[in-house]
């Protein structure tokens, strides 16, 4: 599958659900939001915030951590990490509609000083070498067909003593060059 195809697929269309949930909360258009109010519908992976708490504990994520999330979706994990740990997060999302919603929700949670959202293809973006202490991804890497480039990019931007945490589908066969 080509990355261009992924960009046009609309892999997940949760945007309407988010705005419907906000209407149900009486917070459809304005005013502050809390991370807890969003966490039941902005986590696009299994086990919601429990999965993030597990990563926080395993990796000892704290306010000194510099985190990059690959495939950040609506920004739920990034906001939760920032709120719970005080860490700074760079959240990369390929789909523009998800990115736009993530930016909007992060601003409403007043976490835009802790979470930087970037819309783009992780394989094409440039990040500082040896910069991040933690890379995370929940159910996103299997959408990236060029795993060799993906992993090489991760190695380049991760500090030598850093951690790479992934929850994803796995294939039980050897990887090829793609």
Where do the model's predicted regions map?
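Class I SAM-dependent methyltransferase SAM/SAH-binding core
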Residues: 66-70, 74-124
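Conserved class I S-adenosyl-L-methionine
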Residues: 165-178
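Conserved alpha-helix/loop element of class I SAM-dependent methyltransferases that forms part
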Residues: 45-63
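A short SAM/SAH-binding and catalytic strip from SAM-dependent methyltransferases
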Residues: 133-146
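N-terminal, positively charged/glycine-rich alpha-helical extensions of SAM-dependent methyltransferases
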Residues: 1-36
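Class I SAM-dependent methyltransferase Rossmann-like catalytic core
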Residues: 36-46
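A short glycine-rich, Lys/Arg-flanked "PGG" loop and its adjoining helix->strand segment in the class I
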Residues: 148-163
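A short acidic, Gly/Pro-enriched loop at the edge of an enzyme's catalytic core
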Residues: 125-135
